[in-house]
């Protein structure tokens, strides 16, 4: 007999709590998006944080968005930027784009050149929205 979804979830949680960062990343995404489980942003935050601390780029990206938007936690622009930088350094194009957006929001004139560098990296990695923002900054 195949295990139920609840039994599978218990095993996943146990593996995460035993220190499996990949399982923590999996659980964080499941709870963040509400896939196969009811959405629970508090649990998502906990599991994604664990995975992020082990260097999981997607977890860092999702956490960055949570801190940026205040979704499931208090908004924290500095923490969002830190997490997006970690994910961007691992090649996540949308994280590169978000780094640029936060830099521009913090201090447009001071951070413009650095933001453009991040937008170019994002665009070169195939994130088309970065092209649009680059043309807006140049235009």
Each language-model region and where it sits:
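Short helix-capping/linker turns of helical repeat alpha-solenoids
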Residues: 18-21, 33-35, 40, 53-56, ...
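Terminal, low-structured helical/coil segments at or just beyond the last alpha-helical repeat
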Residues: 3, 123-139
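Helix-turn-helix repeat elements of alpha-solenoid scaffolds
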Residues: 1-6, 40-42, 76-77
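TPR/TPR-like (Sel1-like) alpha-helical repeat modules
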Residues: 110-128
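Hydrophobic face of amphipathic alpha-helices that form TPR/SEL1-like repeat modules
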Residues: 26-33, 37, 62-69, 98-105, ...
């Amino acid at each position: 007999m195949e295990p139920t979804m609840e039994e599978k979830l218990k095993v996943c949680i146990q593996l995460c709590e035993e220190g499996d960062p990949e399982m923590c990343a999996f659980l964080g995404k499941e709870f963040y998006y509400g896939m196969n489980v009811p959405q629970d942003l508090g649990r998502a935050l906990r599991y994604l944080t664990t995975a992020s601390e082990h260097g999981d780029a997607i977890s860092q990206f999702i956490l960055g968005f949570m801190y940026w938007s205040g979704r499931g936690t208090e908004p924290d622009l500095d923490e969002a930027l830190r997490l997006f930088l970690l994910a961007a350094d691992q090649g996540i194009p949308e994280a590169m784009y978000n780094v640029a957006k936060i830099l521009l929001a913090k201090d447009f004139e001071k951070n413009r050149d650095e933001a453009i560098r991040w937008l170019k990296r994002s665009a070169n990695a195939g994130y088309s929205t970065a092209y649009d923002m680059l043309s807006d900054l140049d235009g």
